[in-house]
């Protein structure tokens, strides 16, 4: 489990995240949503150990501030918003970087085949020999996800859940691949791991998230299930946009259409 209590982050003397309480449980997808500049990525970087913070964050019972990077890498893998490479790596070489720590959790002898298996999962079968720089933005994003999957291939290792931290994992993808990637996240959670994902698409969030954490001006504005959180009033307050939230009869699933704008 990931637990964060009263977490704040200051950058260049300015408070970006203030007093946030958060928890991510194994077996669920936790989505962080909010407008641009609300502190989502900054908070995720604190959760992943990249940014300094005040307050307390625990990862599987361990105080995050006392964990070494190699130790954190066993428990969680991070997909950033964007990754730039300056050298002509092949796709397979990029994906293999996820195996550097040697704790993928794959069965003995399977590590050598993991890059190809991970690429197949993100619908890039046959791309291993291509150069990374030759790919489109969406293809590069999926290569990076394959790398991350190799790092924590087994969602549970030594009896402890592992976590995927995904910062806008579908931002560059067409609708088919958005669904593929979100199904990968859901499957990872179903098999005992946990997922923390920053998302902008409220409909995908409603479809896949077990709980939503809504950030606004560096603080949490709401927390709960999609049914509890997504409402006309909250969207107007947080996103400064008057939209009507509909509900699908099957599963009581909320949805939001831009055509419902009531300006």
Swiss-Prot record:
**Similarity comment text for this entry:** Belongs to the ABC transporter superfamily. Heme (hemin) importer (TC 3.A.1.14.5) family.
| Superkingdom of the organism of origin | Bacteria
EC number annotated for this UniProt entry: 7.6.2.-
Q: Which residues bind ATP?
A: 34-41
Q: Where is this protein localized, as stated in its record? A: Cell inner membrane
Ranges for the ABC transporter domain?
2-242
Q: How does it sit in the membrane?
A: Peripheral membrane protein
Which InterPro entries does this entry report, sorted A to Z? AAA+_ATPase, ABC_transporter-like_ATP-bd, ABC_transporter-like_CS, P-loop_NTPase
What is the annotated role of this protein in its UniProt record?
Part of the ABC transporter complex HmuTUV involved in hemin import. Responsible for energy coupling to the transport system.
Q: Name one GO molecular function term.
A: ATP binding
TM spans (from-to)? none
Q: What SUPFAM superfamilies does the entry give? A: P-loop containing nucleoside triphosphate hydrolases (SSF52540)
Q: Which PANTHER family match?
A: HEMIN IMPORT ATP-BINDING PROTEIN HMUV
- Tell me the organism: Mesorhizobium japonicum (strain LMG 29417 / CECT 9101 / MAFF 303099)
The protein, known as: Hemin import ATP-binding protein HmuV
Going by the record, the broad EC class of this enzyme is translocase
Quaternary structure (record): The complex is composed of two ATP-binding proteins (HmuV), two transmembrane proteins (HmuU) and a solute-binding protein (HmuT).
Annotated keywords = ATP-binding, Cell inner membrane, Cell membrane, Membrane, Nucleotide-binding, Translocase, Transport
This entry carries the following GO cellular component terms, namely: plasma membrane
